[in-house]
Swiss-Prot record:
Name of the molecule in the record: Virion membrane protein OPG140
Role this protein plays: Envelope protein which is a major component of the mature virion (MV) membrane. Essential for membrane biogenesis. Is required, together with OPG144, to form bona fide crescents, which can progress to form the immature virion (IV) membrane. OPG140 and OPG144 form a lattice that is stabilized by disulfide bonds and serves as an anchor within the viral membrane to which several other proteins important in virion structure and morphogenesis attach.
Keywords: Disulfide bond, Membrane, Phosphoprotein, Transmembrane, Transmembrane helix, Viral envelope protein, Virion
The species this protein was found in: Variola virus (isolate Human/India/Ind3/1967)
Virion surface side: 32-44
TM stretches of this protein: 11-31, 45-65
Length: 90
């Protein structure tokens, strides 16, 4: 299955997963900072990794939605056919 088609089918699920990862990064950071003992590396790594993955997924979904609105293949080919004569398209 094509990756873009799969993302198009599960767009809202992937976007929600990115938002959940951002929320989890905040929770992990809160757990790490609220402890009175010295912080452990596990909570820091979980917080940083979930933040990075959440940002990548969320920004990727925004870029994908803009690609679908402005650069989808059926839109681009439609613009080419309406702006040019049949001779120049061939």
């Amino acid at each position: 299955m094509d990756m873009m088609l799969m993302i198009g089918n599960y767009f809202s699920g992937v976007l929600i997963a990115g938002i959940i990862l951002l929320i989890l990064s905040c929770i992990f950071a809160f757990i790490d900072f609220s402890k009175s003992t010295s912080p452990t590396r596990t909570w820091k790594v979980l917080s940083i990794m979930s933040f990075i993955l959440g940002i990548i997924i969320t920004v990727g979904m925004l870029i994908y939605s803009m690609w679908g609105k402005h650069c989808a293949p059926h839109r681009v080919s439609g613009v080419i056919h309406t702006n040019h004569s049949d001779i120049s398209v061939n």
